[in-house]
């Protein structure tokens, strides 16, 4: 039935702060043409599309009735070299949420986007996770 994650929607208050972060700092390309007047931006992250959708103020209401508040707990980007990814993001002055964590399944470091959403840079231990 379910085959893979296709996209996620991140609700945000200030698209003008979020777009440069995901485009220039994280380095994700636009998946569709970006038009600020539309109130959203789509970025390609591997096989998953991340949509930033502006809410509040004059932005149109787009939330599903009964849905939780804007934002989400966290999401993760797999990287090949954690130290290199950390160094690259340090050069952009990102705000780190924690030091590197060594767990049985992942090595990761967490950071904040401009609206306080938590992103993780992860190096998964595919064998420990039971993945090929």
Where are the language model's segments positioned?
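Conserved beta-strand-loop-alpha-helix junction that forms the acyl-donor binding cleft
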Residues: 12-15
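Short, conserved charged micro-motifs
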Residues: 17, 82-85
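Conserved active-site tyrosine of GNAT-family acetyltransferases
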Residues: 18-25, 89, 116
């Amino acid at each position: 039935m379910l085959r893979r994650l296709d996209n996620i929607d991140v609700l945000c208050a200030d698209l003008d702060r979020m777009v440069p972060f995901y485009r220039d700092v994280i380095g994700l390309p636009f998946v569709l043409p970006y038009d600020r007047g539309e109130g959203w931006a789509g970025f390609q992250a591997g096989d998953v599309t991340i949509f930033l959708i502006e809410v509040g103020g004059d932005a149109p209401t787009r939330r599903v009735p009964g849905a939780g508040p804007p934002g989400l707990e966290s999401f993760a980007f797999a990287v090949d070299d954690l130290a290199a990814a950390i160094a690259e993001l340090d050069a952009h002055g990102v705000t780190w949420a924690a030091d590197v964590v060594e767990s049985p399944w992942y090595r990761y470091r967490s950071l904040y986007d401009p609206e306080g959403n938590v992103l993780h840079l992860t190096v998964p231990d595919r064998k420990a996770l039971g993945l090929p």
